[in-house]
Every structure is written in C-alpha cells, then in structure tokens.
From Swiss-Prot:
Pfam (any one): Lyase_aromatic
Record flagged with keyword tRNA processing: no
GO cellular component: cytoplasm
Modified residues annotated as 2,3-didehydroalanine (Ser) in this record: 146
Family per record: Belongs to the PAL/histidase family.
Protein name: Histidine ammonia-lyase
EC number: 4.3.1.3
GO biological process, one term: L-histidine catabolic process to glutamate and formate
Pathway per the UniProt entry: Amino-acid degradation; L-histidine degradation into L-glutamate; N-formimidoyl-L-glutamate from L-histidine: step 1/3
PANTHER family reported in the protein's UniProt record: HISTIDINE AMMONIA-LYASE
Catalysed reactions, semicolon-separated: L-histidine = trans-urocanate + NH4(+)
One Gene Ontology term of the molecular function aspect: histidine ammonia-lyase activity
PTM section of the record: Contains an active site 4-methylidene-imidazol-5-one (MIO), which is formed autocatalytically by cyclization and dehydration of residues Ala-Ser-Gly.
Length: 508
C-alpha cells in the first residue's frame, strides 16, 4: 500500500504531518513555489561568494571568528570543517522517529528559501527521508542557541558521507547507507554547512512528538480519573456545566464536558445517590480545574510549535527579493524552551493528581474497599507497591519540572552570551511524558480492580469501554503476581492509542 505524500513548502507543515513522517508513514515532496524560492536565494549567495564583500558564514569564520576573512579557494573547506567541528554530540542517539522528524523539519525550513541552500543538497535531504536513510544524532550537546548546532551537525555529516546513519532501521556508516539507498553525498558550497546546522529543529523534533503525546495523555488522564471516580463511588455533580460556566477557563470546561461524556449512563452513580458523603476529595472533585489547567498549558505549547516549525531560523537570512543577507537571532530557542517547560509541568501535575487518586483507591479507610484492593489482605499485598511506584515517578517528575528555560551558560568566548537550553527542556519533557504515561497506566490498572469489586453495577459508557479493554489484556488479580507486566500491558494500550479509540467510540 502506497504511503500518503506530504508537500513541503516551508509554510504549512502540520504537527500531525510531522508525526506521519516520523513514523515513516508518509513520503515528502518539495512544492514548485518552494523550489523557486530556494533557487533564488541560492543565486544571491553565489553572487556574494563571487565578490569581495564580507558576508558572515559565506566568506568569514564563525562565532567569535566572524572577523576572519576566508579566501575563495577555501570556501568549500570552510563549510566542511564547520560540520566536522560542530559534530560534538554525546549520549544515546535520538530515537528513529525523532531523527526523522529532525530531518523533515530541516527540509521544511530550507524550503522557505531564506537559507541559500542549493537544490541538489535539499533534494538529497528529501530523498533520504523517502528512502529511509536517517542520520544517527546523539541527543546531548545543544544549548539551544545558535540553535541546535551539535545535533544538526550530526545530521549534516550524512550529507557529506561522514558519520553514521540508519538505513531501513540498520545502523551503519553514512556512506554505506547512502550507497544502499542509491544516493550520493554532496560537496557543500558556500554557506551550505551553516544553512544545515543553524536552527531550532532538534528541539522542535523532540518537542513536536512530545506535544502530540502530551495531548493524548491529557485525554487519558480524564479517562483514568473517571474510572477511579466510579470505583470510589464518587459524585458526578462537580462536573455539571453550571459550575464551569461561572469560571470559564476553556480547559476546565473541556475537561468537565469530557468527563460527562465518559460517565454517561453510569449504573454506579445511581447506586449511591442518597449516601452520607457530602464532598469528594480534591483529586476527584477538582479534576476539571487541575486537568483543565494542564490542557491549557499544553495548548500554549502547540501554538508555539505550530509557528516555529514553519519559521526561518537560519542565520544569516538570505532575502533574495531585496538582495540582502542579514544576520539576526531567529535561531534562539527561547520560545520552544518555555513551551517545553510548560508541557513538563503540565504533565507532572497530571501525574501528581493521578498518584493521589491511586492512594484513594488502595487506602481502605478512604475507599471502603479491601486494603490495597487485595483479596485475603495480609497474605496478599495487592496494589500496595503500585502506588509507591507512582509516587516515585511523581517525585522524579517534579525534579525534572525545574525549568530549563531560566538557565543560560555563555559560550563561544562570550559572543553567544545568552542561550535557551531548549533541547534540555524538550528532552526532560520527553522523560516526564514517559513517567506520566506510567502513572496513568497504574491508575487505570488499579481503578479496573476497584471496578471489579463494584460488579455487577457498571460504570459510565466511556469508563466501561476502557475497563473492558483493560480486562481483555489483563485479568483481575485474585492473588499477588508480578505487576510489572500488567503495567506494561496497560501502558501499551495507552501508547498505541487503542484505549482512547475505544473510549471515543463508546462516547461518540
């Protein structure tokens, strides 16, 4: 079956399209208008390179070496040396989806026509994507200005036949990967090395996939919370529209409406209409307020990313229409750094309130259910340590929620005296999202056990769909067993989208 094709024009790339390419589920093609812009900007660079006027990155050194003039005969070596010298990354390589997203995003910014790249070089990048040649990019080494220099240098190594790449998932020398794909490396001309390494695409690649995952986890948090509410015989009244209309934060209203859909047709709520309990704990009653605030933080990040992935973040920028090549600071990753910190904090709050709901479920004095939801408690410990694991993940998430965006370490002999730490923010946000996924999986698993004790009464339609899917993969726990596998099974339902799909189908 042929893959859908995404047109790259530098202006209209969507986050969801980035995910498609990251998963190798779509091919890419350069738009004709973008090709025209690329050729026009390259023509200006060629004219400047042929002249004697100094132009940063074309016939000068880089950073604090910008005042050093480079002889015309050395311009190719200048660009090659830039790539080689900046490939200083360390750590594990970016996962393949993030590395593909990185390559795509660099193609998109080059397609805007402000970088001065040659069509031959951009065509190689597009061919690499379509033939599954993915650069090996160590994930550590960027301070987020001048953009993501080290990660992008590792990306650019493959263009010149250096470094390493994955070809169809197999790691090998870059030159071999290109040969297997029927491609040839390029010799970089004036400015091309700089055009490949200057920008925010690494933090945006990690950030885009984090963003889409965070949006999914925000929905999962509502499902988990609704299941817990039903297992604890909680009230639906805190979610009525009137309460949220008088404090009209959009995220809060959205969560309340989502919870109402998940809880519709609940048999459990009718079973305790006249109970003596007056109010539920905050972790249940305040789900719209807490989950809603997290959603709004995540929505803020989406707005930033949607602009950034379609922005020219090179330096200098080539304005072919006015025949100017101008140095600026569009490579500075501060917008992304702030956005990624907000996502991490939002996900940590979802994990934190989830862990508190798990405590409500396993604590017999709060749940009026068997201690730790175990039959024959004492002999069996039930879900005691599942709550401890959740607490550990929340604690580490809180540490990782310290903002990277307020940090800065000067570099390049003081020329680059303020940096964004955007890649740091994105990477720690990714880790926080892993923890949030696990926390919510634990809550769903524990809530399913609680719902077993409420049978034959059934929860609302959405909660029931989630419960039944979980039970199709993980049986009720009659006696102690290794819970790691159960947590992983539910985590897989979360990551695959299967759980959300089941809930959405039931509540459509």
């Amino acid at each position: 079956m042929s893959r859908p094709r995404i047109l790259i024009d530098g202006d209209t790339l969507k986050l969801e399209e980035i995910l498609q390419v990251a998963r190798n589920e779509a091919t890419v093609e350069l738009s004709p208008d973008a090709a025209t812009r690329v050729r026009a900007s390259r023509a200006l660079v060629d004219r400047v390179a042929a002249g004697d006027t100094p132009a940063y990155g074309i016939n000068t050194g880089f950073g604090t070496l910008a005042e050093v003039r480079i002889d015309k005969k050395d311009l190719r070596d200048l660009q090659r040396n830039l790539i080689l010298s900046h490939a200083c990354g360390v750590g594990t390589p970016l996962p393949l989806p993030e590395a593909r997203a990185l390559l795509l995003l660099r193609c998109n910014v080059l397609a805007k026509g402000y970088s001065g790249i040659r069509m031959e070089t951009l065509a190689l990048a597009l061919d690499m994507l379509n033939r599954d040649v993915v650069p090996v990019v160590p994930e550590r080494g960027s301070v987020g200005a001048s953009g993501d220099l080290a990660p992008l240098a590792h990306l650019a190594l493959v263009f010149i036949g250096e470094g390493e790449a994955f070809y169809q998932g197999q790691r090998m020398p870059a030159k071999q990967a290109l040969e297997r794909a029927g491609l040839q490396p390029v010799v970089l001309e004036a400015k091309e090395g700089l055009a490949l390494v200057n920008g925010t695409q690494a933090m945006c690649a990690v950030g885009t996939l984090l963003q889409l995952r965070a949006e999914s986890l925000a929905d999962i948090a509502d499902v988990a919370g609704a299941m817990t509410l039903e297992g604890l015989l909680g009230s639906h009244k805190p979610f009525i529209p009137e309460i949220h209309d008088v404090r009209a934060h959009p995220g809060q209203k959205d969560v309340a409406a989502h919870l109402r859909r998940i809880l519709v047709d609940s048999e459990l709520v009718e079973s305790h209409v006249n109970c003596s309990k007056v109010q539920d704990p905050y972790s249940l009653r305040c789900m719209p307020q807490v989950h809603g605030a997290a959603r709004e933080g995540i929505a803020f990040s989406r707005r930033i990313l949607e602009v950034e992935v379609n922005s020219a973040t090179d330096n200098p920028l080539v304005f072919a229409d006015t025949e100017r090549i101008v140095s600026g600071g569009n490579f500075h990753g501060q917008p992304i750094s702030l956005a990624m910190d907000v996502v991490a904090m939002a996900l940590t709050q979802l994990s934190s309130i989830s862990e508190r709901r798990v405590e409500q479920l396993v604590n017999p004095s709060l749940s009026n259910l068997p201690a730790f939801l175990a039959k024959n408690s004492g002999l069996n410990s039930g879900f005691m340590i599942a709550q401890v694991t959740s607490a550990a993940l929340v604690a580490e998430s809180r540490v990782l929620s310290h903002p990277a965006s307020v940090d800065s370490i000067p570099s390049s002999a003081g020329r680059e005296d303020h940096v964004s730490m955007g890649m740091t923010a994105a990477l720690k946000g990714r880790q926080v999202s892993d923890f949030a996924r696990s926390c919510l999986a634990i809550e769903i698993l524990v809530a399913a056990q609680a719902l077993d004790f409420r049978l034959p009464l059934k929860p609302g339609k959405g909660a029931l769909a989630a419960y039944e899917l979980v039970r199709s993969k993980v049986p009720h726990m009659d006696k102690d067993r290794e819970l790691h596998r159960d947590i992983e099974a539910v985590s897989q339902l979360v990551d695959s989208g299967e759980l959300l799909a089941a809930v959405r189908s039931a509540t459509a």
